[in-house]
Amino acid sequence: MLIDWFTVSAQAINFLILVALLKRFLYGPVLRAMDRREERLASCFAEAENKRLEAQQLEENYRSLLQELEEARGVKLRQVEEEIEDQRHKLLAAARQEAAEIQSAWAASIRDERSSFFTELKKRVGSEMLNIARKSLGDLANIELEQLMVERFNERLAQLDRNEQQQVALAASERGVLVRSPFTLPPELRDRLTQGVRQALGEEIDMQYQDRADMPLGIELTVGGLKLSWGVDSYFEQLERDVATLYDAQAATVSEGSP
């Protein structure tokens, strides 16, 4: 098989363009959002610190009062001392409880916000990547996007080890397979994909195709509880891990600066 170096070079250039666009339009907004979140968290921790200082000041005031009362040495002194000590414990417990609630609410907010962020990120980046990939591949190469997806997926099937192949083939022979893609594959590409699946898993396998506009760019084959796929979802997962690491590092920095 001859390698079309022009196509390979074009795809490499396309990938670099895509990385540059992601860096320009994705990481910048993410960092700004984290900066705003850091400011809000710093304000919350400052409020908690003020309450702690107020409780500490109250404790110091009560200690001073205790010292004065101790000089009186009487029955009333012990009663007042007990009341003051009880009140001190209540105030400190309330301050600690409020600080703990603020920190717990902040942690829950971080988890919810990050989950929502990555859900929206996958949705938006997936849509933009699909449009960019279609246009770029159409401009820079003669291979259509759908054809490239089918070729890569067939290569993925051919690379299965013997155990994986036997496991999937057994399930497929009993239940058939369902192939999903984000857009409708032309008949000739469906035939090519069907041929690749049957060569890898068995000639008598029943196949069904389904369009899923909400799925990431790629092809997914499911057999019962088994799933094989090739697409950009793995890149999303790596991007999610990278951003999560950055997000957690920022949150840890704020936590270390808190009391």
UniProtKB/Swiss-Prot annotation:
One Pfam family per UniProt: ATP-synt_B
One term under GO cellular component: plasma membrane
Matches recorded under CDD domains: ATP-synt_Fo_b
InterPro entries: Alt_ATP_synth_F0_bsu (IPR017707), ATP_synth_b/b'su_bac/chlpt (IPR002146), ATP_synthase_B_chain (IPR050059)
Signal peptide positions on this chain: none
Single GO term (MF): proton-transporting ATPase activity, rotational mechanism
Compartment list: Cell inner membrane
Entry keyword set: ATP synthesis, Cell inner membrane, Cell membrane, CF(0), Hydrogen ion transport, Ion transport, Membrane, Transmembrane, Transmembrane helix, Transport
Record's bilayer topology term: Single-pass membrane protein
Subunit structure: F-type ATPases have 2 components, F(1) - the catalytic core - and F(0) - the membrane proton channel. F(1) has five subunits: alpha(3), beta(3), gamma(1), delta(1), epsilon(1). F(0) has three main subunits: a(1), b(2) and c(10-14). The alpha and beta chains form an alternating ring which encloses part of the gamma chain. F(1) is attached to F(0) by a central stalk formed by the gamma and epsilon chains, while a peripheral stalk is formed by the delta and b chains.
Annotated NCBIfam families: alt_F1F0_F0_B
Function: F(1)F(0) ATP synthase produces ATP from ADP in the presence of a proton or sodium gradient. F-type ATPases consist of two structural domains, F(1) containing the extramembraneous catalytic core and F(0) containing the membrane proton channel, linked together by a central stalk and a peripheral stalk. During catalysis, ATP synthesis in the catalytic domain of F(1) is coupled via a rotary mechanism of the central stalk subunits to proton translocation. Component of the F(0) channel, it forms part of the peripheral stalk, linking F(1) to F(0).
Family: Belongs to the ATPase B chain family.
Name of the protein in question: ATP synthase subunit b 2
Species this chain originates from: Syntrophotalea carbinolica (strain DSM 2380 / NBRC 103641 / GraBd1)
